Amino acid sequence: MLSQEQLDRINELANKSKVEPLTDAETAEQKELRTAYLEAFRGSFKNQMMGIKIVDEEGTDVTPEKLKQAQEEERNKQ
């Protein structure tokens, strides 16, 4: 995940852009930080999904097949 300083900088640039236009350098920095944030978020979300098992009230595994396949592929990588 991104450091707190990077998250603060993302918010600082977002707030500044609402008040005044960003410079070209600031716009490039904002884009780079947002890309890094999205990569970290997606990676974290994927890790969470790879550990999920869905069961109904009766205890039957109802995890979608697509997710089961992705989990199996992930296990085989390691």
UniProtKB/Swiss-Prot annotation:
Belongs to the UPF0291 family. SUPFAM superfamilies: YnzC-like. Residues 57-78 are annotated as: Disordered. It is found in: Cytoplasm. Keywords: Cytoplasm. This is UPF0291 protein Exig_1097. Transmembrane segments: none annotated. Pfam families: DUF896. Residues 63-78 have a biased composition (Basic and acidic residues). InterPro entries: DUF896. It comes from the Bacteria. One of its GO terms (cellular component) is cytoplasm. The keyword Cytoplasm applies. The keyword Cytoplasm applies.
